[in-house]
Amino acid sequence: MRIGLLGFGKSNRALLDYLLENGEAEIFVSEEKRLDDDTKSYLRKCGVDFEEEGNTEKLLDCDVVYVSPGVKPRSDIVKKLLAGGVNISTELQFFLDRADKEKVIGITGTNGKSTSAALMHHALSHRGLKVFLGGNFGTPAVEALREDYDYYVLEVSSFQLFWCERPRVSRFVLLNISEDHLDWHSSFKEYLNSKLKPAFFQEEKDTFVYNKNIETLEDLSRVKPKKIPFWTEDTFVEENRLVLQGKSFPLPGSYPLQMKENILAVSVLYNELFGDVEGFLDSLRSFKPLPHRMEFLGKIKGRSFYNDSKATSTHAVLGALSNFDRVILIMCGIGKNENYSVFIERARPRIKHLIVFGEIYRDLRPFLSNVPYSIVSDLEEAFRKALEVSEEGDVILFSPGGASFDMYENYAKRGEHFREIFERYKKEEGES
């Protein structure tokens, strides 16, 4: 059988290694971008045929093509593959076809899915279980096939799920849904359907945990598994209390709104698995939040700085803003074809001053007539401007609302740059 790998990012690289280890000899790699010399040397050494700087019809000779999650479904090469009757799949589906599905936990949502997956992994590990954490976050799922685990905790994205034919997981968590990735998906409905797909492949013995506040959820009567909603009258988080099925538990700290939702969703599933809320809360005490997600950096001249570089959509920015009264907000990056009029209308009461740079300014500009704002050229200038327009006691929030790729390799590099600038200014001010 001839296997094609369309795109050679992290997931397909991991899949290639697994295929080679298991004796699959006829593999063809097709990458739209230029491959680095080390990668080409490795492929030649392994006897793998490849092409770079474009995807050609050579892929049509493959029996199955595993698509990197970032490949858009309406790209020319995908259209040709579909027209040619080539079976299209993805690395996540490859894993699910071979793993013990009773052990797989899938977590998705527009915001909070990485942190929730990490929290679920931490809570299970705290219980003494051997747990794999990966998927869209961190390690590709296929890596887990080399060992046996008690549980596989996977963050799954809409891109991955779109390409999956039958993504069944025994436990599935849907955190939230809002407009996102409309530069990739053809419509919000397609995005929503991708996010929901695992629920429709679950069996009656499985569990589906979901946010009751998602207004766009369709009728779930066709969903077979046990359905457990959160944000209900008896299952919610309020201030520093977790309430599960009417029973109240004190949280071990104060958390931003999105983190509260993450805690709520994970606690619901954990309680369903073990009936041990106290055990979950005990694990929460030692959980370290992921960087670049409402990360408090410290203070300079009495101003509080927050790094929320992971916020790549306006929905995520609104979530960050909800933690404060009025802030100095820094936005940048590439917009995702969202409704920016509605965003500004909802965000305006919480914005003292907006500082913006990058491509997203074009999206925001028509709606800024009643918002005090400044246009800058880069993050360094944005930081200086934020100090200039703020006063002691203000919050300076870096929550970009757009993808990073216009100026940075990824959101993490962008967040690291913001942190570096903060540390430099803090040192210059002589503050500890």
From Swiss-Prot:
Belongs to the MurCDEF family. It comes from Thermotoga neapolitana (strain ATCC 49049 / DSM 4359 / NBRC 107923 / NS-E). Its EC number is 6.3.2.9. GO terms for cellular component: cytoplasm. Cell wall formation. Catalyzes the addition of glutamate to the nucleotide precursor UDP-N-acetylmuramoyl-L-alanine (UMA). One of its GO terms (biological process) is peptidoglycan biosynthetic process. It comes from the Bacteria. It is found in: Cytoplasm. One of its GO terms (molecular function) is UDP-N-acetylmuramoylalanine-D-glutamate ligase activity. This is UDP-N-acetylmuramoylalanine--D-glutamate ligase. The keyword Ligase applies. The keyword Iron-sulfur does not apply. Signal peptide: none annotated. The gene is murD. Pathway: Cell wall biogenesis; peptidoglycan biosynthesis. Keywords: ATP-binding, Cell cycle, Cell division, Cell shape, Cell wall biogenesis/degradation, Cytoplasm, Ligase, Nucleotide-binding, Peptidoglycan synthesis. It catalyses: UDP-N-acetyl-alpha-D-muramoyl-L-alanine + D-glutamate + ATP = UDP-N-acetyl-alpha-D-muramoyl-L-alanyl-D-glutamate + ADP + phosphate + H(+). InterPro entries: Mur-like_cat_sf (IPR036565), Mur_ligase_C (IPR004101), Mur_ligase_C_dom_sf (IPR036615), Mur_ligase_cen (IPR013221), MurD (IPR005762).
